[in-house]
Design a protein with these regions (language model features):
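C-terminal substrate-binding subdomain of Rossmann-fold SDR/epimerase-dehydratase oxidoreductases
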Residues: 7-132
C-alpha cells in the first residue's frame, strides 16, 4: 500500500534493500473463491497452494510496476541502501515459488493480475481521499 500511496502522491518509491525477495501473489477475491471451492471440493487434511503462478515477483519488480502503472512518468524507484543494511533488521532475502496445480485441478484459476490489483488499489485510495 505504501508504494501505491507514494506513487499517487508523485513521490519516488524508496527501497532500502535490493528488493530481491520473491514470492507468488494472489488477489483477495481470487483467494476467497479458492477457499469456497476448497470448502466444497477440497480433500480434508490436504494442503493446497492458492497463488497466481504467473505473478511471481520480487519486491523491486513490484515497486517498478507501481511506479510505472500508478505513478506514470513522474515516479521512479530509488535504491537507498545503507552501508550497514544488515543492522536494520530487514527480513532476509527469500525466494518462495508456490504451485497452484492442485487448485487448478479443482477448476480454480486466478483472474486478477498484479497490475490490475495495484490499479484497483490506487482507485480505492483516490476515492477514499476524496471522500475522507
Amino acid at each position: 500500500m505504501q508504494f501505491t500511496q507514494h506513487a499517487l502522491d508523485g513521490r519516488d518509491i524508496i527501497l532500502h534493500t535490493k528488493g530481491d525477495s520473491m514470492s507468488n501473489f494472489c488477489y483477495i477475491t481470487d483467494a476467497v473463491r479458492a477457499i469456497i471451492i476448497l470448502m466444497t471440493q477440497g480433500d480434508m487434511g490436504e494442503a493446497y497452494n492458492v497463488c497466481h503462478d504467473e505473478e511471481t515477483r520480487s519486491i523491486a519488480s513490484i515497486a517498478n510496476l507501481v511506479a510505472c502503472h500508478v505513478g506514470g512518468d513522474k515516479v521512479s524507484v530509488v535504491f537507498d541502501i545503507p552501508e550497514n543494511v544488515s543492522s536494520f533488521g530487514y527480513a532476509p532475502t527469500v525466494h518462495m515459488f508456490l504451485n497452484s496445480r492442485k487448485m487448478r485441478n479443482l477448476s480454480w484459476e486466478p483472474k486478477v493480475t498484479m497490475k490490475d490489483a495495484y490499479i484497483r488499489l490506487a482507485e480505492y485510495i483516490t476515492e477514499e481521499r476524496q471522500n475522507g
